[in-house]
């Protein structure tokens, strides 16, 4: 690719969909035109490509896409790459249900879409649902233009975004504080009750386990006492065994040591049992019940103690709530004043440079044979972008009443400005029948715009007219053979024949071929 930091789809493989039994296409960078007779499966091919990215339902039993996208952060999703420029492989397998994989790692459809968000930008006749020409985009374009013209503008935008984000955070915290203030009395009562309950219990982290052990000992005290007493009685006569061993010349030191250790352990357990005799079983069970309730409510004794500390801190903050509210109020008013001042400065820049930006937009629109649109600044509620919005003025037309061809060309005009001033789109453009219902002159204008965009982004465009295929770097033909749909990348001779077909069908084939050769030669 010309800009290898941008995304590039290098291969598409499809198995068994409604049109293609088998499809395997390799792609290059730049503009790829997709042509073919009506009904052969051009839109199905594009739908398969979009299905791999989760933008459409999968239309095949298996779709596989190889993709280069060095800027994608795949490690967040557990997919590690030694080389960020190595191809990623997206696989979609459809059986009883549809499953998605990235480099053989299974992902949900939503996770895949989140990872690949913004990687594919699609222009089609269903354009208004995408709400692409919104005031956020238009304001970003104007700001990008100003930043390109005047280096003093960018620090203002950065400062406003930082201060406004801080302002929003403080306002949210103040609202929470004011909510607490409204219910301060009730909240204090509840927190004091919880504090008193936890303090009265005097919680110790190992107490619950110790009481459980005591309960266990109490439940089997008599049986254990008898067994320990009998064992100790037996151990009193074990000296006879050691004496006998020594008298016949064998060492009894190991046995003596083991018997002494056993005696000590049994005496220790006997002491525990004697201590249990002084315990009140009812009090032990009552305390265990209380601690069980605490563990159920807080998860553990440790968490309950942490909660007690938090409650004490909350009670302290409630006593200081009026002081905190006043501090928040002063800081918020200070930030508002600073943000408004920045908004005024930003507004001044926008007013100064709007005419120049409108001139550029009009020039792009004129190249695409559109009436000159213009952008008008209007006041808007303050945000991190300022206190203005841009409204698109289409002379005597409304955005909603534009034909699909007019809208697509207008969108192309803005995309050309995006490429020039924002430079933030690193994905792939997919264009569905951009030149349908256009005049030859309009189609030529669209093809030139796409050629310019293809210097920055890989583009796939279904085309019904000759201009896009003639200017395209790659030409893919979808056709039928023996009632089966196939697709292939055309060489130069095949491109001439396909463009000739698009020009004149089967009639006047010689003149059509001659014209096709001229079109291809002109773009070399």
Curated annotation (Swiss-Prot):
Binding site for ATP: 36-43
GO biological process, one term: SOS response
Entry GO MF terms: ATP binding; ATP hydrolysis activity
GO cellular component assignments: bacterial nucleoid
One Pfam family matching this protein: SMC_N
Record's keyword terms, sorted: ATP-binding, DNA damage, DNA repair, Nucleotide-binding
Function, as annotated: May be involved in recombinational repair of damaged DNA.
Entries under PANTHER family matching the protein: DNA REPAIR PROTEIN RECN
UniProt similarity note: Belongs to the RecN family.
Full protein name: DNA repair protein RecN
Gene source species: Helicobacter pylori (strain ATCC 700392 / 26695)
